[in-house]
Amino acid sequence: MKRYLLILLILIAGCAPWVKIGGLYTSKPHNFSVELPDGWMRFNTPDRLYITRDGVLLQNILIERLHIEKSLKHTKKKFAKGMLPQEVADLVLDNISSDPTVLNFKVIENIPARISGSPGFKVVFTYKNKDGLRLKSMLYGLIVDEYFYGIRYTAACRYYFDHDLKTFEKVFGSFRLIKTV
């Protein structure tokens, strides 16, 4: 019986999705590297890297890479090679605002930005979730080769957004594409 309990505990521990992080994180399959903050937790999916310190509903940083031929979840629209950064920003904002869980969506800022030395965009927006929690996001995005890269920080407007903004800025500043055309 003890042996089965030990095996069960090992299996459960092996399935734990959140991993404590800190330092350089490199994803060769996703073609990027980034410095992750000490003490935060990481969760990977096939297209995304999530990190949080206090829980994804309070604050999270998301780094995603999507193939441009993949339809966006809420609008079913696709990116195209050669799109201008502002066109990419408009497509992304349209997709986010079409999410039924995003309420009272408001764009605060939408400007050009450089990301890992390449032209991209920066958008800042607020919204409420279905529970009425007011959230603020800062999203940088660009298309390189056949992929869209997005680096997004989302946090509760009250306390968390301002509290962890410098951490996000450090993460964003360390983001590097491993290979570019």
Model-derived features: positions:
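Secretory pathway targeting signatures of secreted, lumenal, and periplasmic proteins
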Residues: 30-90
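Signature of long, low-cysteine stretches enriched in small and polar/charged residues
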Residues: 86-142
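Surface-exposed amphipathic alpha-helical segments
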Residues: 40, 147-181
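Sec-dependent N-terminal signal peptides
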Residues: 4-13
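A mature extracytoplasmic/lumenal domain signature
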Residues: 38-40, 55, 125-129, 139, ...
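Bacterial Sec signal peptide processing site at the extreme N-terminus
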Residues: 12-30
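Short, solvent-exposed coil/turn segments at beta-strand boundaries
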Residues: 55-57, 116, 142-148
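Structured segments of extracytoplasmic/periplasmic soluble domains
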Residues: 43, 95-99, 126, 171-174, ...
